[in-house]
């Protein structure tokens, strides 16, 4: 039986420098250097010194796996947040097709679209006509939208949000596919109109503008998300109204386009995880998101209620295209587009933040620091 320390005590100078690293045995070193030991990983064979490159390659995956066991919110949003994204996304897509059906398959709906299409260009104030005529340039809409979308992709790539880059790619494909509905959806002949009798929904230019705006919103960091929502929503409204002033599209085309894009974006956000989220340790509540999101959602709902009230007032004159219904139809159309855009972008802003930055202990503190590599440490002794 071996002697213990009580039988052969080791006397050390209390004033001498102590090398705590050399004093630990190999088992203690392994417990310190194992990045998953504190996270409850299963013990395995004792590792020998590995190259730094091999260690770094597997460290990210190992830490994600360990953090997922310790705190699942570090690698994926709450289930309730993902369910909200899916539910609101489906509701917006359903609303898009509901508006299209009401405005295309009913007499009052076609009359409403026809009044706005025919009378809006000549009933705008002078300053608004100038702005709309500038925006209603196809090359300008494409150029500005591409710049906004490119800024979003660059922001995601610079932040190394690779899962988010993949989500953006899927969203772009879905938005492009939605424009193919224009050649598929029917438009029955119900009333005689001066506008083209073929289906024109959804609006391709509005889809492009809205898609670029939502890409920017979901890709930028927390500090500028609220600003991105305001800028993107404003650009979407300008493009949507401009294509109506230029008589390229009807009111229902624009509303359908905005709701489709935001609805598809919310469904894509339901699959957010890992690098599609903010880094752990940087997840905090955002005052700007709370204020701007609340204003957009509340303001959007109020504007939509006002638009619905005005439509109800002019409804008796729609089927005869009465002159007294013209002004109300125009006001309700523009106000409705602004309200729907504000509500959609406000919801998207709020849901993007709760999927990107779910609050938890590790989300606030951050992941444990990476320990030094044994081989590299021994080489520096």
Residue ranges and their predicted role:
Residues 166, 170-174, 178, 257, ...:
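Alpha-helical transmembrane segments in multi-pass membrane proteins
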Residues 84-97, 170-174, 296-303:
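Alpha-helical transmembrane segments
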């Amino acid at each position: 039986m071996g002697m213990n320390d009580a039988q052969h005590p080791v006397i050390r100078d209390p004033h001498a420098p102590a090398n705590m690293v050399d004093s630990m045995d190999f088992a203690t070193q392994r417990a310190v250097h194992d990045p998953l030991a504190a996270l409850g990983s299963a013990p395995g064979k004792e590792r020998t010194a590995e190259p730094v490159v091999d260690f770094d390659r597997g460290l990210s995956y190992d830490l994600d796996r360990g953090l997922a066991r310790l705190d699942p919110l570090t690698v994926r949003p709450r289930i309730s947040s993902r369910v909200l994204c899916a539910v609101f996304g489906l509701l917006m897509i359903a609303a898009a097709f509901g508006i299209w059906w009401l405005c295309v398959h009913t007499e009052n709906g076609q009359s409403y679209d026809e009044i706005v299409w025919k009378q809006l260009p000549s009933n705008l104030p002078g300053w608004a006509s100038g702005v709309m005529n500038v925006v209603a340039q196809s090359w300008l809409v494409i150029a500005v939208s591409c710049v906004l979308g490119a800024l979003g992709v660059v922001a995601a790539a610079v932040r190394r949000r690779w899962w988010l880059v993949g989500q953006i790619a899927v969203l772009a494909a879905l938005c492009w596919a939605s424009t193919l509905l224009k050649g598929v959806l029917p438009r029955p002949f119900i009333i005689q109109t001066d506008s083209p009798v073929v289906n024109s929904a959804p609006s391709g230019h509005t889809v492009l503008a809205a898609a670029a705006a939502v890409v920017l919103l979901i890709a930028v960091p927390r500090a500028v998300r609220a600003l991105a929502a305001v800028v993107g929503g404003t650009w979407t409204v300008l493009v949507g109204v401009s294509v109506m002033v230029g008589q390229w599209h009807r009111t229902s085309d624009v509303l359908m386009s905005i709701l489709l894009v935001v609805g598809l974006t919310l469904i894509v956000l339901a699959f957010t995880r890992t690098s599609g989220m903010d880094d752990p340790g940087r997840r905090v509540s955002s005052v700007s998101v709370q204020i701007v999101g609340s204003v957009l959602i509340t303001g959007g709902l109020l504007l939509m209620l006002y638009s619905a009230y005005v439509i109800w007032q002019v409804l008796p004159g729609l089927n005869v295209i009465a002159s007294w219904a013209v002004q109300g139809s125009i006001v309700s159309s523009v106000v409705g587009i602004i309200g729907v855009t504000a509500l959609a972008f406000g919801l998207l802003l709020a849901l993007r933040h709760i999927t990107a930055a779910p609050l938890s202990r590790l989300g606030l503190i951050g992941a444990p620091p990476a320990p030094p590599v044994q081989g590299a440490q021994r080489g520096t002794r």
